[in-house]
Swiss-Prot record:
Pro residues: bias regions: 273-287
Lineage top rank: taxon: Bacteria
UniProt miscellaneous comment: Has a long half-life in vivo.
Name of protein: Toxin zeta
Variant or mutagenesis effect after changing residue 67 to T: Loss of activity
SUPFAM superfamilies in alphabetical order: P-loop containing nucleoside triphosphate hydrolases
Residues where substrate binds: 66, 100, 118, 120, 128
Annotated effect of mutating residue 158 to A: Loss of activity
Organism per entry: Streptococcus pyogenes
Length: 287
């Protein structure tokens, strides 16, 4: 039996051409293109960065998201049956190759690009920015600045949503993977700032408010602003709606036995106002 993780060059090229045709629909190549590299820990809500970029480019930008190519593996359904939740690591080499090929082809033609990432390391953004600048691109980096408790809850909610859709392939983000990005992102961003490769590094919160721009304050590193936001204390009232949504999804998914569910329930109970004592009924005379 052939290894179903493998795929032929012809299969790959056919899918690549289909993707390119679909992605360039309604988009125009420009004389001075810009590439926007995105960063932020898992669960931070990086897709919300697209709104600011669409506004900046009047919608003339192509989003390249590695995750969207994973299910395009020619043998994806068979791989799901075989590996279930571990399918992601078996299709990632395919999605990585697809992402690289799409970036290469579209940047040859001069389209504005949005390239998803996390900022877990500095190598990939540096390599990508260097390669694109050699093709005449201006490179910018936009990063989510979200308190770590909010993004961690975001990873749980995303998993529960995926589980409701397809329990077999839903894959939780380990807390350790989330925390590694939280720990490394501020220093990595400072390193990227010092390279001078990016004409602007911006920080945004989930509401789309710009918290920092290296273009506006070039002498100030983004590190301090990001660290402050990552470690910002969030009130119980702020996260209560999120906790309630997650609790509801976990009940529907029958995940009440998980440590996460118990921790969320405990937190919600602590946010409830204390029950006032029942007033004693005064005794009536003669009774």
């Amino acid at each position: 039996m052939a290894n179903i993780v493998n795929f032929t060059d012809k299969q790959f090229e056919n899918r690549l051409n289909d993707n390119l045709e679909e992605l360039i629909q309604g988009k125009k190549a420009v004389e001075s293109p810009t590439a926007f590299l995105l960063g932020g820990q898992p669960g931070s809500g990086k897709t919300s960065l697209r709104s600011a970029i669409f506004e900046e480019t009047q919608g003339n930008v192509i989003v390249i998201d590695n995750d969207t190519f994973k299910q395009q593996h020619p043998n994806f359904d068979e791989l799901v049956k075989l590996y279930e939740k571990d399918v992601v690591k078996h299709v990632t080499p395919y999605s990585n190759r697809m992402t690289e090929a799409i970036i290469s082809r579209l940047s040859d033609q001069g389209y504005n690009l949005v390239i998803e990432g996390t900022g877990r390391t500095t190598d990939v953004p540096i390599q990508t920015a260097t390669m694109l600048q050699a093709k005449g691109y201006e490179t910018k980096m936009y990063v989510m600045a979200v308190p770590k408790i909010n993004s961690y809850l975001g990873t749980i909610e995303r998993y529960e949503t995926m589980y409701a859709d397809d329990p077999m392939t839903a894959r939780a983000t380990p807390k350790q993977a989330h925390d590694i990005v939280v720990k490394n992102l501020p220093t990595n961003l400072e390193t990227l700032h010092k390279t001078g490769l990016f004409s602007d590094i911006r920080l945004y919160n989930r509401e789309g408010v710009k918290l920092y721009s290296s273009l506006e304050t070039p002498s100030i590193s983004p590190k301090e602003t990001l660290e402050k936001e990552l470690n910002r204390k969030v009130s119980g009232k702020e996260i209560q709606p999120t906790l309630e949504r997650i609790e509801q999804k976990m009940v529907l998914n029958k995940h009440q036995e998980t440590p996460e569910f118990k921790a969320i329930q405990q937190k919600l109970e602590s946010l409830q106002p204390p029950t006032p004592p029942i007033p004693k009924t005064p005794k009536l005379p003669g009774i």
